[in-house]
């Protein structure tokens, strides 16, 4: 897969995590909205639950419970990106994270294995290997019209 094949905006279809111990989960549930966009200038990803309640006050004065609920129903990150090459599982895409809701990713590289099938973009990644939370994340995206 070439960089040109990936360029553009893709809408989220599904996000599932499969744990090494056999569990599966949907981090933000199964009713999602959002997109990932790849351009010549960088990439941006945002995913959120479709039923996010509004905060009971302004973003600065909302209760801690409201802030936790908002954080737990939304995910985003942005930065540069490149196609690193091919692996036995697909094309390796490196996301050079400059900004993230999850600050631990900032300044790092998030690698995704990409495949294109039936007009859909499949991105997969491994997380927390060697821990009880070791898992594979699988995201499916449809090109935006």
Q: Where are each of the predicted segments found?
A:
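Lipid interaction determinants
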Residues: 1-145
